[in-house]
UniProtKB/Swiss-Prot annotation:
Annotated metabolic or biological route of this protein: Carbohydrate biosynthesis; gluconeogenesis
Cofactor(s) it depends on: Mg(2+)
Catalytic reaction list: beta-D-fructose 1,6-bisphosphate + H2O = beta-D-fructose 6-phosphate + phosphate
Name of the molecule in the record: Fructose-1,6-bisphosphatase class 1
UniProt record, GO biological process: fructose 1,6-bisphosphate metabolic process; fructose 6-phosphate metabolic process; fructose metabolic process; gluconeogenesis; sucrose biosynthetic process
Gene Ontology terms: cellular component: cytosol
Stated family: Belongs to the FBPase class 1 family.
Name of the gene this protein is made from: fbp
Residues reported to bind Mg(2+) 2: D109, D112, E272
Taxonomic source organism: Nitrobacter winogradskyi (strain ATCC 25391 / DSM 10237 / CIP 104748 / NCIMB 11846 / Nb-255)
InterPro entries named among the record's database cross-references: FBPase_C_dom (IPR044015), FBPase_class-1 (IPR000146), FBPase_N (IPR033391), FBPtase (IPR028343), Fructose_bisphosphatase_AS (IPR020548)
Top-rank EC class of the record's enzyme: hydrolase
Keyword check for Magnesium: yes
Keywords: Carbohydrate metabolism, Cytoplasm, Hydrolase, Magnesium, Metal-binding
GO molecular function, one term: fructose 1,6-bisphosphate 1-phosphatase activity
Length: 345
């Protein structure tokens, strides 16, 4: 495998001339070009007029930044030239039907983590490609296991594109000289187990008992049930967290909790959880709500939210197991500060 293989060459190597396969290739190529244009904007920041200032709220109630709007338009313009039946975006209230007879539909989050723009942290784009069903209005009411392709782009120190076509995961890095994505990682595999976890620990008091028990195990380190010392990570950018997990393993948790509006988490199933779950499973990891496999979920609405726990398969399975333990048992076994220390002798 050549380190200089381009994304286009990799896609050409997939073979197949049927309309479905060709449409997927065209959509991926268009998304990659859009990502290059968005990368140019993020790199220039304030020099390109990117201030990170709020521009109101999107249809789902989240604060909308100026770059959210521009990234959304860049992607819509790129995909509008492809044989696509319908588009769905975080920034759009309803499905945008383009060509009902086309073979594929594309959902995307144009700029994940946009709250990080002002602090110069990584942001990204996430996308999911689905086959067009007989009723195009039901395009994104399909189980995640129906996805034809999924990917995400991280606009960080490098601009990286992570892609699965359902046969493993590849990573491409933007060559800024040639302005093309080049293959830098093939058949990526997530370690089966790792000692890093990512969660916003400030919300601990709102979590349900299984999540609290799992994090308590991690914090107990070698003295706890896991018998290992863990490190915590939290970037607040889904794409950055996912990329780290692909490279080093570990587990990411954005659970539902007891706060109003957070009962089902905050991540969207169609254009965040589904594509991430597809990628993570293709890399040998797991993706779950804690109780259900994410790829088995069928969206009830375009902007449905869902808890997301993903990463190294053994870590995810441990948390799933804790969801089967009665709450009384979890409370009885809750660690305080480990086997030894100020509060335990």
């Amino acid at each position: 495998m050549s380190q200089e293989m381009t994304l286009q060459e990799r896609m050409d190597g997939e073979g197949g001339s049927d309309p479905l396969r060709q449409a997927v290739k065209g959509a991926v190529a268009a998304l990659a070009q859009a990502a290059i244009d968005i990368s140019d904007l993020t790199c220039r920041g304030a020099l390109a007029g990117i201030t990170g200032q709020a521009q109101g709220r999107n249809t789902d109630g989240d604060v909308q930044k100026d770059l959210d709007v521009r990234a959304d338009q860049i992607i819509r313009d790129a995909l509008g030239k492809q044989p696509i039946a319908a588009l769905a975006s975080e920034e759009m209230e309803e499905l945008d039907i383009l060509n009902p007879g086309a073979p594929i539909c594309v959902a995307f989050d144009p700029l994940d983590g946009s709250s990080n723009i002002n602090t110069n942290m990584s942001v990204g784009t996430i996308f999911s490609i689905m086959p067009t069903p007989s009723d195009v209005n039901a395009a994104f009411r399909q189980a995640g296991s129906e996805q034809l392709a999924a990917g995400f782009v991280v606009y960080g120190p490098q601009t990286s594109l992570v892609l699965t076509l359902g046969q493993g995961v590849d990573i491409f890095t933007l060559d800024r000289v040639d302005r093309v994505f080049k293959l830098t990682g093939s058949a990526v595999k997530i370690p089966a187990e790792a000692t890093e976890f990512a969660i916003n620990a400030s919300n601990r008091r709102h979590w349900d008992l299984p999540v609290r028990a799992y994090i308590d195990e991690c914090l107990a380190g070698a003295d706890g049930a896991g018998g290992k010392n863990y490190n915590m990570r939290w970037i607040g950018s889904l794409v950055a967290e996912a990329f780290r997990i692909l490279i080093r393993g570990g587990i990411f948790l954005y659970p539902g909790d007891a706060r109003d509006g957070y009962e089902e988490g905050r991540l969207r199933l169609v254009y965040e959880a589904h594509p991430m779950a597809f990628i993570v499973e293709q890399a040998g990891g797991g993706a779950s709500t804690g109780r259900k496999r994410v790829l088995d979920l069928v969206p009830g609405s375009l902007h449905q939210r869902v808890p997301l726990i993903m990463g190294s398969i053994k870590n995810v399975q441990r948390l799933e197991h804790l969801h089967t333990v009665p709450d009384g048992a979890l409370e009885a076994n809750a660690p305080l500060f480990g086997n030894r220390g100020l509060f335990r002798v």
